């Protein structure tokens, strides 16, 4: 019996020179997503997915490692210039931006897009430890 031969087309990676880096830094984790201008994700990494667990996920070093991993994957698409959108109150905000700069990505602008309520929902009660 003859084997059926399948011709598979290789997926062509598109070249994107300008991108947007979305950095979401919470108190527990840091998520770095690099998208094109339309918002289609090119690469992403988290500090939890980078091998950090527990309280080490929320450290600036974990955010730096996550940003470096996301930048390495984005460089395969030919990304050179990056606008940075930073969201959240976490400790990994600055170190993630610095890590993108070190990876030969030219940071063109840094914008803080943290949502602030105009006295909306009631916040959770304070912790008593």
UniProtKB/Swiss-Prot annotation:
Signal peptide as annotated in the record: none
Keyword Amino-acid biosynthesis: no
PROSITE patterns xref list: RIBOSOMAL_S11
InterPro entries in the record: Ribosomal_uS11, Ribosomal_uS11_bac-type, Ribosomal_uS11_CS, Ribosomal_uS11_sf
Key word Iron-sulfur present: no
Keywords: Ribonucleoprotein, Ribosomal protein, RNA-binding, rRNA-binding
One term of GO molecular function: rRNA binding
GO cellular component, one term: ribonucleoprotein complex
Pfam family, one: Ribosomal_S11
SUPFAM superfamilies: Translational machinery components (SSF53137)
Biological process according to GO: translation
Record Gene3D superfamilies: Ribosomal protein S11
Function: Located on the platform of the 30S subunit, it bridges several disparate RNA helices of the 16S rRNA. Forms part of the Shine-Dalgarno cleft in the 70S ribosome.
Assembly, per entry: Part of the 30S ribosomal subunit. Interacts with proteins S7 and S18. Binds to IF-3.
Family to which the UniProt record says this protein belongs: Belongs to the universal ribosomal protein uS11 family.
Identification of the protein by name: Small ribosomal subunit protein uS11
Gene name, Swiss-Prot/TrEMBL: rpsK
């Amino acid at each position: 019996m003859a084997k059926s031969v399948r011709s598979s087309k290789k997926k062509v990676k598109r070249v994107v020179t300008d991108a947007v880096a979305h950095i979401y830094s919470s108190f527990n984790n840091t998520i770095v997503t690099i998208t094109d201008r339309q918002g289609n994700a090119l690469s992403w990494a988290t500090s939890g997915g980078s091998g950090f667990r527990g309280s080490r996920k929320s450290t600036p070093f974990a955010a730096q490692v996550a940003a470096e991993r996301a930048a390495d994957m984005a460089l395969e698409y030919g990304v050179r210039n990056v606008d940075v959108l930073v969201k959240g109150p976490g400790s990994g905000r600055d170190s993630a931006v610095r890590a993108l700069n070190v990876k030969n990505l030219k940071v063109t602008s840094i914008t803080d897009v943290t949502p602030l309520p105009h006295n909306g929902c009631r916040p959770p009660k304070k912790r008593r430890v």
